[in-house]
Amino acid sequence: MLGYAVCHQIEERSFFFHDLQSPLCARCTGMYLGGLLTILYQAFHGRKGKFPPTWVFVILGSFFIWFAVDGINSFLQFIPGFSLGWQPSNLFRLITGTGVGLGIGAILLPLFNLTAWSDWVNRSFFEKWFSFPLLLVLGGLMVAGVYSQQPLVLLPAILLSGLSVVVLLSSLHTVIALMLTRRTNRQLTWFEMRLPLLIGLNLAFVQILLTSLLRYLLTGTWAPLDL
């Protein structure tokens, strides 16, 4: 249900571990795993809450544009005679999804820190010149590993892709919960964050449930889309 709520799950655009289909398509796999990778990458550098510098935003913005253009090109394949000039592939979908995922993570964790913590630091995770290029290298290695479809890499990636949906949605809803309950910048410890985190987690599952039910009502099936 985790993938069903956020992804079309078209078989031709998904990875398989033997007969086990990934819960997310190639593009969504890249997006959610990229977001999780970026959050974990930043998590070891303190409670920094300043957004990335302009040059990083420019690169991240180009990823979003590429994501949109490649997505449009993939959609046009369903219309005979329409194309933007290149053949869509799961590799392109995975790369563009990962690029957007890096952007989501690069914005979401600073937003979480500056909203949650009373001792957040007004510095960027990417203030050192090598921090962002290193993240790009890690993202590239992730893409190469997933696209290789080697069992030792693909199976953990499939499992983590589902987990990443919960992590990203819960983080976003926790930020919203902090704002709505007027608890921004009041916490010093994770123990003090237990209620906002619980609210965020529950809201994430409510969103997943409602979105899944809406999709079922519209399609009449729990199966992946068959276009």
Q: Where do the PLM segments sit?
A:
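Secretory/periplasmic and organellar redox-cofactor proteins
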Residues: 1-14, 20-21, 29-38, 42-227
